[in-house]
């Protein structure tokens, strides 16, 4: 739950807590929060243990589809399309249809340089209605 918080974020939270709660109430608030998180973790581990006891070996069978679903949720649409419809070959999506021969990388043609903008002499056009 708090795995994505870095030490810098935690320091900012402590400083904000110190400003909002004050130095007298901050240790009690930290203690209360840690106890609440510990109780929630114990409750969730108890629920997991109870499910394991109630379902028995079917619990592990239930975990396999759930882990596959979790993998699919993390995929981008392009990765899902590549994996399931194209069997991992993404050359259709990337445009790299021809494989390089003997491991030699094909060099793309250099991009054409944009034509230089012609220098205009004279007065700059002015539109009184546009300004």
Swiss-Prot record:
It comes from the Bacteria. Part of the twin-arginine translocation (Tat) system that transports large folded proteins containing a characteristic twin-arginine motif in their signal peptide across membranes. Together with TatC, TatB is part of a receptor directly interacting with Tat signal peptides. TatB may form an oligomeric binding site that transiently accommodates folded Tat precursor proteins before their translocation. Gene3D superfamilies: 1.20.5.3310. The gene is tatB. It is a single-pass membrane protein. The lineage of its organism: Bacteria, Bacillati, Actinomycetota, Actinomycetes, Mycobacteriales. It is found in: Cell membrane. Residues 96-131 are annotated as: Disordered. It comes from Mycolicibacterium paratuberculosis (strain ATCC BAA-968 / K-10) (Mycobacterium paratuberculosis). One of its GO terms (cellular component) is TAT protein transport complex. This is Sec-independent protein translocase protein TatB.
């Amino acid at each position: 739950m708090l795995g994505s918080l870095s030490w810098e974020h935690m320091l900012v939270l402590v400083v904000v807590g110190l400003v909002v709660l004050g130095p007298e109430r901050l240790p009690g608030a930290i203690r209360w929060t840690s106890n609440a998180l510990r109780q929630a973790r114990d409750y969730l581990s108890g629920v997991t243990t109870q499910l394991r006891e109630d379902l028995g070996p079917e619990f592990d069978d239930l975990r396999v589809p759930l882990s596959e679903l979790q993998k699919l949720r993390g995929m981008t649409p392009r990765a899902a399309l590549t994996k399931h419809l194209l069997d991992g070959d993404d050359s259709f999506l990337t445009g790299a249809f021809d494989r390089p021969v003997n491991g030699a990388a094909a060099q793309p043609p250099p991009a054409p340089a944009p034509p230089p903008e012609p220098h205009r002499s004279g007065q700059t056009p002015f539109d009184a209605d546009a300004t």
